[in-house]
Design a protein with these regions (language model features):
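Domain-scale recognition of functional cores that engage charged ligands
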Residues: 2-313
């Protein structure tokens, strides 16, 4: 969305021009899949074909409303679902106000959520408790397992949130037995060599990035110099808003080869700065879609990074 706004402002084309349509198609497919699972494919198709009024099926979007980055993302996706599916009953609830009962997630009008989009790390949710010390996370997952509601981003997403997943992917790549040739080509090109903590002592001397496996927003990211059986700090990410970054506490780390980046000069709100670009790609299921770019004066990017529009000459 932001890329499109910037491109329109300067009268240029941009690489994400078809990606909004891709997002709408994905959201429509998800919407139909959730309701088909609830009512059965034949009944749902019949209701749509006969233009019957569908029962109230609230699709709830939720985050902590005072965390503005998450709030903006949540509102954007909720509005895009409404654009893709005008008939959808979309609602926003702050995590501060969300409750659960024996039937799922109750809403103010007496109904219950059919689907929930939550912008809150699953690795935190699973251990959270109520003020009475009841296992809120466990109860939430039990309700999900009982099909009282569907999840836009299901518990399986916790696998990708754990940074040691990259170590697993790379370890399997090294066996030369698990992936197809196209898969291996992708891993070799796009994934920096990644290692489990226990493998660090066997690595060659040199510079490595050390990351907490549950870290977020650059917190506790370091570059270390390995020399034999010892290592010393070479560079560390200092996060200004350390206490505001919500992530699971963990002492476990993983390592990646430190790859020197190209430097770029970029004009920002406070003048001209030298720094580094980070390119990202949004995935819709297994389909690559929109691309994005950030600029940071620091080699280890965090919340200080600037949004950079991508335009086509």
């Amino acid at each position: 969305y932001a890329n499109e706004v910037a491109a329109n402002y300067v009268g240029r084309k941009h690489p994400n021009i078809e990606c909004r349509k891709e997002l709408h198609t994905f959201l429509k497919r998800m919407y139909d899949a959730v309701l088909s699972a609830k009512y059965g494919r034949n009944q749902y198709d019949s209701m749509r074909a006969n233009r019957e009024s569908l029962p109230k099926d609230p699709f709830v979007f939720s985050c902590f409303h005072d965390y503005f980055e998450d709030y903006g993302t949540t509102q954007f996706l909720m509005n895009e679902l409404k654009t893709a599916c005008p008939e959808a009953d979309t609602r926003f609830i702050s995590f501060y106000d969300m409750k659960i009962d024996d039937e799922g997630i109750p809403l103010e009008d007496g109904s219950h959520a059919t689907l929930l989009y939550r912008l809150h790390p699953m690795e935190l949710l699973i251990d959270e408790q109520t003020p009475d010390n009841e296992p809120l996370g466990e109860m939430f997952l039990d309700l999900y397992e009982d099909d009282t509601f569907a999840l836009f981003n299901p518990p399986e997403s916790i696998i990708l949130q754990n940074k040691s997943f990259m170590s697993l992917v790379y370890a399997l790549y090294l066996t030369d037995q698990f992936y197809t040739k196209p898969d291996r080509d992708i891993i070799e090109r796009y994934l920096a060599p990644s290692y489990f903590e226990n493998d660090f002592s066997a690595l060659d001397d040199g510079l490595y990035i050390q990351k907490e496996i549950w870290g977020r927003e650059g917190r506790h990211v370091q570059v270390v110099q390995k020399r034999g059986d010892t290592s010393e700090l070479y560079m560390e990410k200092l996060v200004d808003n350390y206490d505001d970054i919500v992530c699971r506490d963990s002492k476990k780390v993983m390592y990646q080869d430190f790859i020197q980046q190209k430097r770029f000069t970029h004009t920002v709100d406070c003048g001209v700065k030298d720094g580094f670009l980070t390119l990202s790609c949004f995935m819709l299921g297994d389909q690559a879609s929109a691309v994005g770019c950030r600029f940071s004066p620091e080699e280890i990017a965090g919340t200080e990074a600037y949004f950079v529009p991508l335009l086509i000459e």
